[in-house]
Amino acid sequence: MISTNDLRPGIIVDLDGTLYLIVTAQHVKPGKGSAFVRVKMKKLSDGSTIEQTFRAGEKVQRAYLETKQMQYLYSDGEHFVFMDTDTYEQVTLSGDIMSDVQQWLKEGMMVNVQFYQGKAVGIEVPTFVELEVVETEPGVRGDTAQGGSKPAKLETGAVVQVPLFITEGDIIRVDTRTGEYVERVG
């Protein structure tokens, strides 16, 4: 159990059998009445976000996740399949759980799969991924007075804004937290 006063972004709690990731936690002490904690949480099972208010000092169940490094094999559209490279055991995750990270997954990529009580509940992709640009408009010299950007479609289907000098076939590094171009790799 953890006090609501100790809730911070990144902590995972179990409320009535459902896992939530704390996105924001704001401690409020009004002039009149007792203090409370306003929390924005993301439901791990489907990615939906809710806001909830707890009394200060109230106890909630903290969930500790086990993390195992696994290899991403493939997706059949609805489900994503991962394999433990030591035991060759395969785990399948639904598209609901994968909604915010699926655009960064490339076959063969190593990711951390999170387990709670033996059941896979989510994944962590690397902070930076290197992906090939498969479609972008050619950058024309003299288009802008200062550096501009253009959309580029990557091999995974993700679309990111890149500098004008990026061409099709270039390998770029992307920050998966923000979805932003970092640098050209090759």
Curated annotation (Swiss-Prot):
One GO CC annotation: cytoplasm
Pathway assignment: Protein biosynthesis; polypeptide chain elongation
Similarity annotation: Belongs to the elongation factor P family.
Can you say what this protein is called?
Elongation factor P
Gene3D superfamilies attached to this UniProt entry: 2.30.30.30, Nucleic acid-binding proteins
Q: Name one GO molecular function term.
A: translation elongation factor activity
Question: What is the superkingdom listed in this entry's lineage?
Answer: Bacteria
State the UniProt keywords alphabetically.
Cytoplasm, Elongation factor, Protein biosynthesis
Q: Amino-acid biosynthesis as a keyword?
A: no
Q: What does the entry give for GO biological process?
A: peptide biosynthetic process
In the record, which residues are listed under signal peptide? none
UniProt-listed InterPro entries: Elong-fact-P_C (IPR015365), NA-bd_OB-fold (IPR012340), Rib_uL2_dom2 (IPR014722), Transl_elong_fac_P/YeiP (IPR020599), Transl_elong_KOW-like (IPR013185), Transl_elong_P/YeiP_cen (IPR001059), Transl_elong_P/YeiP_CS (IPR013852), Transl_elongation_fac_P (IPR011768)
